[in-house]
């Protein structure tokens, strides 16, 4: 599956805020946006008027970068969200939140969505007892996400499991630190999604 392979700090600088794509590094003085809080490139420090389309485009790009989704699958998520009953923008966010890599991150079993995606791809997690290595896998209410038994010996996995015990889990998930597993207890409501996304701008962009 295709994925972005460029510098993650450049993405944060482009959006003008921390997207927490590099986990622990984002909380240190090494964070690029703390040192250079302007857009990358030759004209990054210049000011220019942004059009309505430009604002909508930036909202979409920011959402894509937060969740690590390329343009074509992101458009597919939007079209799926349009077909669902309810508010399209909220449906879109709910689909993105239900990605397996995002759920692993939300449970604290990845320091960032980037790391969570990598761990899923390497087969460290099961869903309802079966190994799933597809980051975009859509979890459902009642699904149980767990660290594979053979993966629990990994030093990095051990560290993440220990740290997850002290991390606040979103209300739509529950986490059992003793067993290193979590469960989806509900679909996330809009107020339970803290990603800095202005979904109405994305809807406006795709409705042009």
UniProtKB/Swiss-Prot annotation:
<dbReference type="Pfam" id="PF01479">
    <property type="entry name" value="S4"/>
</dbReference>
<dbReference type="InterPro" id="IPR022801">
    <property type="entry name" value="Ribosomal_uS4"/>
</dbReference>
<dbReference type="Pfam" id="PF00163">
    <property type="entry name" value="Ribosomal_S4"/>
</dbReference>
<comment type="function">
    <text>One of the primary rRNA binding proteins, it binds directly to 16S rRNA where it nucleates assembly of the body of the 30S subunit.</text>
</comment>
<keyword id="KW-0687">Ribonucleoprotein</keyword>
<dbReference type="InterPro" id="IPR005709">
    <property type="entry name" value="Ribosomal_uS4_bac-type"/>
</dbReference>
<dbReference type="GO" id="GO:0006412">
    <property type="term" value="P:translation"/>
</dbReference>
<feature type="domain" description="S4 RNA-binding">
    <location>
        <begin position="98"/>
        <end position="161"/>
    </location>
</feature>
<dbReference type="InterPro" id="IPR018079">
    <property type="entry name" value="Ribosomal_uS4_CS"/>
</dbReference>
<comment type="function">
    <text>With S5 and S12 plays an important role in translational accuracy.</text>
</comment>
<keyword id="KW-0694">RNA-binding</keyword>
<protein>
    <recommendedName>
        <fullName>Small ribosomal subunit protein uS4</fullName>
    </recommendedName>
</protein>
<dbReference type="GO" id="GO:0003735">
    <property type="term" value="F:structural constituent of ribosome"/>
</dbReference>
<keyword id="KW-0689">Ribosomal protein</keyword>
<comment type="subunit">
    <text>Part of the 30S ribosomal subunit. Contacts protein S5. The interaction surface between S4 and S5 is involved in control of translational fidelity.</text>
</comment>
<dbReference type="InterPro" id="IPR001912">
    <property type="entry name" value="Ribosomal_uS4_N"/>
</dbReference>
<dbReference type="InterPro" id="IPR002942">
    <property type="entry name" value="S4_RNA-bd"/>
</dbReference>
<dbReference type="GO" id="GO:0019843">
    <property type="term" value="F:rRNA binding"/>
</dbReference>
<dbReference type="GO" id="GO:0015935">
    <property type="term" value="C:small ribosomal subunit"/>
</dbReference>
<dbReference type="GO" id="GO:0042274">
    <property type="term" value="P:ribosomal small subunit biogenesis"/>
</dbReference>
<dbReference type="InterPro" id="IPR036986">
    <property type="entry name" value="S4_RNA-bd_sf"/>
</dbReference>
<keyword id="KW-0699">rRNA-binding</keyword>
<comment type="similarity">
    <text>Belongs to the universal ribosomal protein uS4 family.</text>
</comment>
